[in-house]
Amino acid sequence: MELLEEDLTCPICCCLFEDPRVLPCSHSFCKKCLEGILDGNRSPTWRPPFKCPTCRKETVHNGIASLQVNYSLRGIVEKYNRIRVMPRMSQCRVHSGQPLNIFCATDLKLICGFCATTGDHKGHKFCALEEAYEREKLAFEELFRVVEGWKGAEVHSCLESLESAKKKALERVSRDADRVSEYFDKLLRTLEHKRSEILSDLETLKLAVMQTFDPEINRLRSALEEQRRALNIAESFRSLSDPLTFLQQMQDFREKLRVIQGTPLPSRTDMDVSLSALQSFDVKEWDRVRLGQVDKLCAPYESSAYLSSLPPAAAPRFTRVMWRVVLVVCACLPALNFLPSDCLALSFQDKVVALGGFSLPSPGEIVRWLGFCWKEAASICTLLTELCRNCMLDLINTTSDFIS
């Protein structure tokens, strides 16, 4: 068609010939184009010879009316214009240039002659376009009802459930992140790195929640969009009377329907399981972790086996030694108080002799001296406790400075 249009184009205006006139040199031009050239060369006293725009051959200027009409060329142009406005037959995608003029009744597709004889449709049943049009017209109504009655309400309900579950999950994760932030704001700056690390884990969990729900949500939205497009396509060609156009649109409509029907719906059990996996946690569980084990803190949704496996805190060796000293002192104080006061100034041998000569005190004196010993032991315990506390604070501060 493009090559034919070149031969039907006027060399002057570059448009299809309109009332073509032929010169003596056999070249044809539009009547209006020739009139424009002659009007430009017209003089009141003298008319120069007219030269052909193509071959430059001179022609006697006797006016446009004297030129013959090219009836053959005008008829060809008129037929070309009628053919150009007619709908073009679709061509086969597999065999270039071959028109789709056969309908395969087995695969329900438009095919070309090569497809029917040598392609995948060899041996299938074929029918004329008019017959196929009547069959597919009946099948269209049934397929339209299938698409129209597709479980759109169920998809909308499922989509709302997914969005609601996603919102609840993200809100729960956000609340947990806030609680984690509040907890770590109360700690020393040595815990800042761990706080950021756990918040990063929570952000990763948010991403995991979105990666879990978003694909299903997007897939269902795409299915609804495909349903809408299929209905629009169906509404646009359900009243077509041209068999070729109807069958071609029917083929696209079947593809849309196949995509819609192949979209599975997620089960509510999967949604409930995804939401139940985000269990609540209590930040007070971290109170059991000692400062030297901060790096072993578990994120809220990680395994808490570490906390349950922590051994009970053993008393520091320094504290155990102090208590032993206290017990020895408490045991010796009663004996020292029972000795005569002048015995303390004697030599070791004299003390032995003095011990052999003193008598046991009365029960009242024993009770009085026991009370005195208890007060002395309590004072010593208070002093040692204060000493231990100061030592532990110094140890914690030193460790904190070392970690920071």
UniProtKB/Swiss-Prot annotation:
The keyword Flavoprotein belongs to this UniProt entry's keyword annotation: no
Record-level Gene Ontology MF annotations: ligase activity; ubiquitin protein ligase activity; zinc ion binding
Pfam families: zf-B_box (PF00643), zf-RING_UBOX (PF13445)
Source organism of the structure: Danio rerio
Annotated InterPro entries: TRIM45/56/19-like (IPR047153), Znf-RING_euk (IPR027370), Znf_B-box (IPR000315), Znf_RING (IPR001841), Znf_RING/FYVE/PHD (IPR013083), Znf_RING_CS (IPR017907)
Tagged with keyword Coiled coil: yes
Residue ranges crossing the lipid bilayer per the database entry: 102-119
Protein name, per record: Tripartite motif-containing 13
GO annotation, biological process: protein ubiquitination
The record's note on its domains: The C-terminal transmembrane domain is indispensable for the localization to the ER.
GO (cellular component) term, any one: endoplasmic reticulum membrane
Membrane topology: Single-pass membrane protein
Keyword list, A-Z: Coiled coil, Endoplasmic reticulum, Ligase, Membrane, Metal-binding, Transmembrane, Transmembrane helix, Ubl conjugation pathway, Zinc, Zinc-finger
